[in-house]
Amino acid sequence: MPPRASIQETADYLGVSTKTVRNYIADGRLKAVRLGPRLIRVERESVEELMRPIGK
């Protein structure tokens, strides 16, 4: 996964829908940056953090 991935790339990586990724961003579970009016990129570190088991 690239350092900053598209919403579709992130959804494919996590095995969820793009709507779920957008909800994760809105809830603060994933960090994303807006690079233009329609261009959003998700930070790889936040994806790794989301996938890290609790208590580790």
UniProtKB/Swiss-Prot annotation:
Signal peptide: none annotated. One of its GO terms (molecular function) is DNA binding. The keyword DNA-binding applies. InterPro entries: DNA-bd_dom_put_sf, HTH_17, SinI_DNA-bd. One of its GO terms (biological process) is provirus excision. SUPFAM superfamilies: Putative DNA-binding domain. Keywords: DNA recombination, DNA-binding, Viral genome excision. NCBIfam families: excise. Belongs to the L5likevirus excisionase protein family. Excisionase and integrase are necessary for the excision of prophage from the host genome by site-specific recombination at the att site. This is Excisionase. It comes from Mycobacterium phage L5 (Mycobacteriophage L5).
